[in-house]
A protein has these predicted regions:
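A structural signal for alpha-helix termini and helix-coil/disorder junctions
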Residues: 22, 35, 50-54, 65, ...
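Hydrophobic alpha-helical segments
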Residues: 16, 23, 28, 50-53, ...
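Conserved active-site and cofactor/substrate-binding residues in soluble primary-metabolism enzymes
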Residues: 11, 21-24, 38, 54, ...
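Short, basic/glycine-rich phosphate-binding loops at helix/coil junctions
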Residues: 43-59, 118-122
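Active-site neighborhood of HAD-like aspartate-dependent phosphohydrolases
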Residues: 1-41, 45-46
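C-terminal cap/substrate-recognition subdomain and adjoining C-terminal extension
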Residues: 61-204
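Short, surface-exposed acidic
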Residues: 26-27, 56-59, 150
Length: 204
């Protein structure tokens, strides 16, 4: 599943933008990108550029502000109780995502990495950008790794960059999603309670 606005209530890059004093500017770009109005790669690079000069200590402060979506931890526990694996794919950043994953007990994580020199963010990414295509590829790879048929996979997300994985999964769910994503998804949840996903999964 996606992390920002899905597993958690916030958009991590917006929180980082607030720390950099450019919160409103970053949030506007995020909103347009998630609606599919902007090229995601270009929008991400633009927002990351605004974070240049931030100290790496910002990641601990940012994680402290993160709250899990209602039902998120219960969904992970419920999945594990059935012997299922849970992975997250995010256009956000490993520096915060890894802390979220550890707190939630999630099995796999794919996210972006921010470049830092001498403890300061450079405003650039340290590796290839996680795109809608790479989210889909990662879902396919994890299914193969776990020996799970695609018909038995689940994908949950809210943004335009989640559409390919949502459509490819055996059960694809738009969660409190942007209109474009909701229209493209086989299933949709409009209430901020991730445990509702389990009802869909078990019914589908």
């Amino acid at each position: 599943m996606d992390i920002d606005s899905t597993l958690i209530n916030q958009e991590v890059i917006d929180l980082l933008g607030e720390e950099a004093g450019v919160g409103e500017q970053v949030a506007k770009i995020t909103e347009r990108a998630m609606r599919g109005e902007l090229d995601f790669k270009q929008a991400l690079e633009e927002r990351v550029g605004l974070l240049a000069g931030l100290d790496e200590s910002v990641f601990e402060r940012t994680f402290a502000r993160v709250t899990f979506t209602p039902g998120a931890l219960e969904l992970v526990r419920s999945a594990h109780s059935k012997g299922w694996k849970v992975g997250v794919v995010s256009g956000g950043f490993h520096e915060v995502a890894d802390k979220i994953v550890a707190a939630a007990g999630i099995d796999f994580c794919l996210a972006n990495r921010l470049e830092a020199v001498d403890g300061k963010l450079t405003g650039k990414l340290a590796a290839d950008i996680v795109t809608k295509e790479s989210k889909l590829i990662q879902l396919l790879d994890w299914a193969v790794e776990c020996g799970v048929d695609m018909a038995h996979t689940v994908a949950i997300g809210d943004g335009a960059n989640d559409i390919p994985m949502i459509q490819a999964a055996g059960t694809g769910i738009a969660f409190c999603a942007k209109p474009k994503t909701r229209e493209a998804a086989p299933f949709a949840i409009d209430e901020r309670n991730l445990m509702l996903a389990m009802d869909i999964i078990l019914r589908d």
